[in-house]
Amino acid sequence: MLLFAHLLQLLVSATVPTQSSPHSLRYFTTAVSRPGLGEPRFIIVGYVDDTQFVRFDSDAENPRMEPRARWIEQEGPEYWERETWKARDMGRNFRVNLRTLLGYYNQSNDESHTLQWMYGCDVGPDGRLLRGYCQEAYDGQDYISLNEDLRSWTANDIASQISKHKSEAVDEAHQQRAYLQGPCVEWLHRYLRLGNETLQRSDPPKAHVTHHPRSEDEVTLRCWALGFYPADITLTWQLNGEELTQDMELVETRPAGDGTFQKWAAVVVPLGKEQYYTCHVYHEGLPEPLTLRWEPPPSTVSNMVIIAVLVVLGAVIILGAVVAFVMKRRRHIGVKGCYAHVLGSKSFQTSDWPQKA
């Protein structure tokens, strides 16, 4: 297939950084046909671990491979020219493959169709390849994928068998294996070195539990983990030390938009039994796992007492200020009265001076 031919253009040597956990390099490519609206749109996004670092969009005013992380901006003009050329060439091949698949599935040109491809590699703490990926999907369904042995293919329907036979005829698996074991790993090490401070950090989650009434006798407890990196995290609920995996609602880890991630897990519990349930949070950024319970707010009586004390205290302060103001004003008025009385007395009248005849 023409789709895979351009992976081998990613050859480069790189310095292998010291690392303590697995890392991954992934490229996600998508082509969407738009009948009556011109050529299919083609998009590439590249990720190192959970961080997007490059993007290409054929609908941009000037389609180019663009940086999406500060650290990749260290690459020079040659890098961006080369990546842009490869992206544009890959886009042309995707459009050809879209037309080919229309024939395989006996589909018409007046419907929109989607072709997706993910490829990349994982490396372990020792810097060696853990696993390589090369997977293709058509209209949201698995189409063909390279097996974990990197030597054979899995086709998911009759149409994809055609692509499998073509790939086997030219030993496409050998080409993919060469890329995944070599250049893919080398590029990943290079990116880890360039983005070391960002990519190899561990931001611990900030966690708390919220309380949501569900019915007269049930409530939902939701355990939140916010602001963590990397994305790998485990949230569990326990009742008296036993995990509630089957009774727990768990959402997928979501990007927060600031380079960190968020996730929550929820359980429905009987009203009044909330304190028997604990949430446990596991993340590499934590020195030890977190254990949380729902903390009810202070009782209404306590709140009323506090409010009453504050009201009385405020009244005392205001009253004291008023009394002080009145006393000060009275002293001030008394001084002015004595002065006026003295000026008005006869001893200070001009008649005490010698009068003219």
From Swiss-Prot:
Q: How does it sit in the membrane?
A: Single-pass type I membrane protein
SUPFAM superfamilies found in the cross-reference section = Immunoglobulin, MHC antigen-recognition domain
User: Extracellular topology: which positions?
Assistant: 21-304
Listed under GO cellular component are: lumenal side of endoplasmic reticulum membrane; MHC class I protein complex; phagocytic vesicle membrane
Principal localisation: membrane
* Encoding gene, per UniProt annotation: H2-T23
Disulfide topology = C121-C184, C223-C279
- Region Alpha-2, annotated ranges: 111-202
Functionally, this protein is described as follows: Involved in the presentation of foreign antigens to the immune system.
User: Where is the region Connecting peptide?
Assistant: 295-304
| Protein name, per record | H-2 class I histocompatibility antigen, D-37 alpha chain
Q: Which PROSITE patterns match?
A: IG_LIKE (PS50835), IG_MHC (PS00290)
Q: Give the record's keywords alphabetically.
A: Disulfide bond, Glycoprotein, Immunity, Membrane, MHC I, Phosphoprotein, Signal, Transmembrane, Transmembrane helix
